[in-house]
Amino acid sequence: MQLSDFTYNLPKQLIAQYPPKRRGESRLLSLEGASGIVKDRQFIELPELLSTKDLLIFNNTKVIPARIQGTKDSGGKIEILIERFLDQHRALAHIRANNPPRAGRRLVMEQSVEVEVKGRVKELFELRFLDPRPLPQLLEAIGQMPLPPYIQRKTVPVDKERYQTIYASRPGAVAAPTAGLHFDKPLLKRLQAQGIRSGYITLHVGAGTFQPVRVKNITQHQMHSEYVEVSEQICAQIRDTQQAGGRVVAVGTTTVRALEAASAKGVIAPYQGETEIFIFPGHRFHTVNALITNFHLPETTLLMLVCAFAGSEHVLAAYRHAIKKGYRFFSYGDAMFITEAKTG
């Protein structure tokens, strides 16, 4: 299976650089995975695509202001992107600098916060923050929201609110589970009033979500690791939904990865820990029946997951339709509602 199987040409002007004025004002392209039929909709029409037997599952991870600017003790500029917390004062991080710092060096960040480089763990640096404030509190004071590289502008105040779901409650992500950005309080109330149930998993999205696939044969790609929690409570909700003949509707590819990691033995079970699950065409889905997701970059593992779910031919045809119709792409862009292409 070749990387070139997952490419498409996207006009640059369709890459959304800002969110819509209000949540939920996005467009929604529905795709029947079994037939390939697409229909142009608005995201506020989502309740019409769901039944009272269905279960919506959200990722409640919270994006941390993980990007910090500073200088090395030599005076050179440096940028830190936190990947994950180790404890209240230590973290693993990516560092961008002309010459990466060695173990034992001190960095001076915003508000004169000092950071000690403890060593390296593969491509990441282990850092110790020499500040009495716990890291989550410290980052709120000195950090910036880590916008994706294809949003080619500086962070603005609105990003702190809009690059975050309204139900985010578990700090730890360095990228938003973007399918959830479309949901506002009125829509959640409509879904609840319609009798559609919901639940939550946690997957802390890492910077690896933007990691390019560097091999021509995608089966040789090494997937990045992310932390997942799937509780017994959500497992029970899923079992009840399946027994009642309802659909498990994942809000976002991160939710799909969490649920499929927790279903590795064929049935859903509680899961807590790391996952490196790589979902590409040929994967048999055990838990997820429908997917709400944004449009994804060409040749990425996210697009491969969507192609696994609804079939590459149908997905890429839907993308061509979306481009022709002027849909907005990527994190701040429009969304899709996709039903599974049954493979028997």
Swiss-Prot record:
It comes from Nitrosococcus oceani (strain ATCC 19707 / BCRC 17464 / JCM 30415 / NCIMB 11848 / C-107). InterPro entries: QueA, QueA_dom1, QueA_dom2, QueA_sf. One of its GO terms (molecular function) is S-adenosylmethionine:tRNA ribosyltransferase-isomerase activity. The gene is queA. Disulfide bonds: none annotated. Transfers and isomerizes the ribose moiety from AdoMet to the 7-aminomethyl group of 7-deazaguanine (preQ1-tRNA) to give epoxyqueuosine (oQ-tRNA). Its EC number is 2.4.99.17. HAMAP family: QueA. The keyword Cytoplasm applies. The keyword rRNA-binding does not apply. One of its GO terms (biological process) is queuosine biosynthetic process. GO terms for cellular component: cytoplasm. Pfam families: Queuosine_synth. It is an enzyme of class 2 (transferase). It is found in: Cytoplasm. It catalyses: 7-aminomethyl-7-carbaguanosine(34) in tRNA + S-adenosyl-L-methionine = epoxyqueuosine(34) in tRNA + adenine + L-methionine + 2 H(+). Keywords: Cytoplasm, Queuosine biosynthesis, S-adenosyl-L-methionine, Transferase. Pathway: tRNA modification; tRNA-queuosine biosynthesis. Belongs to the QueA family. This is S-adenosylmethionine:tRNA ribosyltransferase-isomerase.
